[in-house]
Amino acid sequence: MKRLIAWLSDLRVAIVLLFLIALASAVGTAIPQGDAPRSYVEAYATRPWLGLLNGEQVLQLQLDHVYSSVWFLSLLAWLGLALILCSWRRQWPALQAARRWIDYSNPRQLSKLAIAESLPCTDSNSALQAFSTVLSQQGWRLERKDNRLAARKGTAGRVGPLLVHTGLILLMLGAVWGVLAGNRLERFLAPGRTLDLLSRDGDSQVSILLEAFQVDRDPAGRAEQFRSQLHLEENGNSLDREISVNHPLRHRGITIYQADWSLAAITLQIGRSPQLQLALRSFPELGEQVWGLVLPTRPDGSEPVFLSVENEQGPINIFDTDGTLLTLLRPGGPAVDVKGLPMRVNSVLPASGLLLKRDPGVPLVYLGFAVMLIGGGLSLIATRQLWAIASEGQLHVGGLCNRNLTAFSKELPSLLRQTALAHQQG
């Protein structure tokens, strides 16, 4: 059992686990996550991922939901256990040892330490008192006994690794909590439409109304930014906010992102008809961003034409059944004859693509990052220990340091010079 615990808490095992988790995260970034199973089968049917895995194998290995897969969560749990065992077996004893006063009573013991010096003096007890005063003035903690003393400084540096491990564990717990208990919803909303979010009991939790949606474009017509004007209603309280790409809205644990855009409907007139608002649908086989509809031009449904559009500014292309381009229409432009019927497009209605995420683990993740940063800062503090023994006209001093021993070896002679000066003046 002890050998198993020692193996689990080994630093090399933790490094391998971190590498595997990083590799899995890279795979989760490269492969789209959370899509319908059929889309993976179709996407990797002719071109396997990395030339190795087809769609069925991607699904079997749970690569379509890496971050919630059993094997990924097992890696996180294993790493968390390794950190806990490492803290228990190594870091906590190191902190206790740094806080424990060790009493060296023989100068020969000090000579075996990493740094050792001797200061000749006429009165060793007086020199010891001067050394004690110098250390106290520079923030050292002291314990004095008869003809000897022990001092330490920077014990907080031993707390740093424990805090780093604690922060990592909190971060992983927050990430797992978010994956298992969080929710994600993607919806396209046309202006004037409402999305109701329900609680687990089926009650309305919050109602989101899209009041307006705007696409900012450059002079060449390329989209630069998407903006949605949202109105939220919750228990009689209302909130109006604008969201855009990289500027989400956070409200009571729910984050609303401006994620995408689409075209929802086209408003047109055919002959003397009233304005007709007809829904558009995507045609990915014609292009990445192509929307359209099939419209009959005769009362019996015959002689249809196909209307296609790529953005809300137009133009609207009208094709015959054989694929011939008949004409172009522009929103707000004049009517154009299409197979004997005057047709006019009033407007094209864009839709806002909203991504709603509820991640209860986010506060825990932020707390974990904060604890890690504090621990990382404390870990930079060197833990130093000094012992001094007054004996027969000599002040024997020895010390230990867990990092930057070179700087400590330069500091000790400086402390002794200050001690000698204080001793002479005293």
Curated annotation (Swiss-Prot):
**Keywords from the named record:** Cytochrome c-type biogenesis, Membrane, Thylakoid, Transmembrane, Transmembrane helix
User: Can you tell me where the transmembrane regions are?
Assistant: 11-31, 69-89, 159-179
Main site of residence? membrane
**Could you say which protein family the record assigns here?**
Belongs to the Ccs1/CcsB family.
Pfam families xref list: ResB
The UniProt subunit note reads as follows:
May interact with CcsA.
Subcellular location as annotated: Cellular thylakoid membrane
Q: Does the keyword Lipoprotein apply?
A: no
In terms of domain of life, where is this protein from?
Bacteria
Q: Tell me, which GO biological process terms does this entry list? A: cytochrome complex assembly
Q: Which GO terms describe its cellular component?
A: plasma membrane-derived thylakoid membrane
**Described purpose of this protein according to its UniProt entry:** Required during biogenesis of c-type cytochromes (cytochrome c6 and cytochrome f) at the step of heme attachment.
Keyword Ion transport among record annotations: no
- Membrane topology designation: Multi-pass membrane protein
Record-given protein name: Cytochrome c biogenesis protein CcsB
